[in-house]
Amino acid sequence: MSLNKAVLEIRQRIKVKPSPTNEPAASWTGTDLVNGVQTKTLTVIFKSAGCRWGKAGGCTMCGYVYDCASEPPSLEDYMAQLEKAMRKAEKFPEFMVKIFTSGSFLDEQEVLPEARDAILKNLTEDPRVTKVLVETRPNYVTEENVQACLSILKNKPFELAFGLETSSDKIRRDSINKGFTFQDFVHAAETAKKYGVTVKVYLMLKPLFLSERQAMEDIIRSIDDAAPYADTISINLCNVQKGTLVEALWEKGQYRPPWLWSIIEILRQAKAAHPELPLMSDPVGAGSKRGPHNCKICSSEVADSLRTFSLTQNPADLSTADCECKELWKKVLEIEDFTYGTPILD
């Protein structure tokens, strides 16, 4: 069975409850480092017509495909979603807006151009919005739609975010089933740069079928490869989302989310190699069985140190906790490659 077929079979078994098309899938506020300054942010996950790649199977770890609308939202629906999300930032004097969907904001079959343009126009006219980021698969980036976005945003800074996950085409194909190549990303990033648009790259630590050590080596190599094209690199730590192939294998004891010690070591090495490149990681679900974790004693502290480092870029803020589980992690790195893919510890 192909990887895509395995993912698609799981998708087809999941029943998604209908939900209002005039409400975002999610929205929240936070703080990001933007041009070296800690900046308030509003993240909006728009409920869209759905990820085109996800409908055909999609990525092995992604449960966001279930966040799409039961029917394509209208222009009015999209504006209502934006209005509801913006209320969460009403007390901020200024903030950055980060736009996501269950797929790609620049896919015109997922988000109609008139809806895309209306959202950007609304944000352009709000003087509090200092920058706009949108996430998209690289194959939907064209000179035409980049120019269209810029013409609406006028002088407001614009950023494109890409879920590259890894610079390895083999891992992206055989572990993630992502459906595009590193060169697809390079072409999209170069198109963005041509028009003065900044680029954010998302990498993912420990997709399926990699040992802990292999996963660490992959991310360190991927940071080196993506650095020439990225203004910021954010490392997502794979977590176990419902209705995914990752979950199916995790339930069988054939997958363990990454150790938090792994991302600590990755960031130390990568920051030394790329001192001027902003590197960040938000350990979603840290400390839980489904999320990246060490032991119960140190997971919370180590996760907090990652969040602090993401804002300060100071390697001294990365946890140096002397926990007993650190020795276990080191032992995992030594011997896991010899256990034929079976995780040593849960």
UniProtKB/Swiss-Prot annotation:
GO terms for cellular component: cytoplasm. Keywords: 4Fe-4S, Iron, Iron-sulfur, Lyase, Metal-binding, S-adenosyl-L-methionine, tRNA processing. GO terms for molecular function: 4 iron, 4 sulfur cluster binding; lyase activity; metal ion binding. It catalyses: 7-N-[(5S)-5-amino-5-carboxypentyl]formamidino-7-deazaguanosine(15) in tRNA + S-adenosyl-L-methionine = archaeosine(15) in tRNA + L-1-piperideine-6-carboxylate + 5'-deoxyadenosine + L-methionine + 2 H(+). InterPro entries: ELP3, Elp3/MiaA/NifB-like_rSAM, RaSEA, rSAM. The keyword Ion transport does not apply. Pathway: tRNA modification; archaeosine-tRNA biosynthesis. Changing C59A: Loss of archaeosine formation. It comes from the Archaea. This is Archaeosine synthase subunit beta.
